[in-house]
Every structure is written in C-alpha cells, then in structure tokens.
Amino acid sequence: MERKLALLLLLGMITLASSGLREKHVQKLVTLIPNDTLRSIMKTIVHKLAKTQFGCPAYEGYCMNHCQDIERHDGSCHGFKCKCEKS
C-alpha cells in the first residue's frame, strides 16, 4: 500500500512540475508528506525534475516565457534547460 501511495505521489508531482508550476509550489505539497525517507526522496525527485525543463525542446517560446517570468530577460533553449541572457 505504501509503495502505491509513493508511486501515486510521484506521478502527481511529475505532472504538476511539468505543467509549468515552479518548484516552490510543488515543495509546498511535499511538506504534507510525513517526515521520513519517503519525504526526502520525493523532495530530491521534485528538485531534479524542476531543474530539467522538459518544455524547453518541446514548446517553441517556452524559454522566452520562462526567462521573462523569472528574470525579465530573453531566453533560449540550451539542451534541456533554458538559458536566460543577461543584459
């Protein structure tokens, strides 16, 4: 039962993370999980998924929107991550 719950939480967090929500929003959900090994594993997974921006190669203009939202700069896709240009 615990394995099924962990898998369900993992899939839910992956869905939320890939839908454009930022890591800070998903980490708020992680705090609802009791303190134990499962919580630390889930926090690590969410952090790693948040660092990889799946929308970068898939959606044209994703990095431009991402960088405008975060840093108010132009952005371009570099591998699987957005690269925000500095002024």
Swiss-Prot record:
Ranges for domain BetaSPN-type CS-alpha/beta: 53-87
Q: Which InterPro entries match?
A: Long_scorpion_toxin_alpha/beta (IPR029237)
Q: Does the keyword Disulfide bond apply?
A: yes
The cysteines joined by S-S bonds are C56-C77, C63-C82, C67-C84
Q: GO molecular function, one example?
A: potassium channel regulator activity
**GO cellular component terms attached to this protein's record:** extracellular region
Q: Which keywords describe this protein according to UniProt?
A: Disulfide bond, Ion channel impairing toxin, Neurotoxin, Potassium channel impairing toxin, Secreted, Signal, Toxin
Which residues are processed away as propeptide to yield the mature protein? 20-27
Q: In which tissues is it expressed?
A: Expressed by the venom gland.
Compartments it resides in: Secreted
Identify the main location.
Answer: secreted
Q: Locate the transmembrane regions by residue number.
A: none
- Source taxon at top rank: Eukaryota
Q: Which residues form the signal peptide?
A: 1-19
- What does this chain do? Inhibits voltage-gated potassium channel.
Entry's family note:
Belongs to the long chain scorpion toxin family. Class 1 subfamily.
Query: What protein is this chain from?
Result: Potassium channel toxin Tdi-beta-KTx
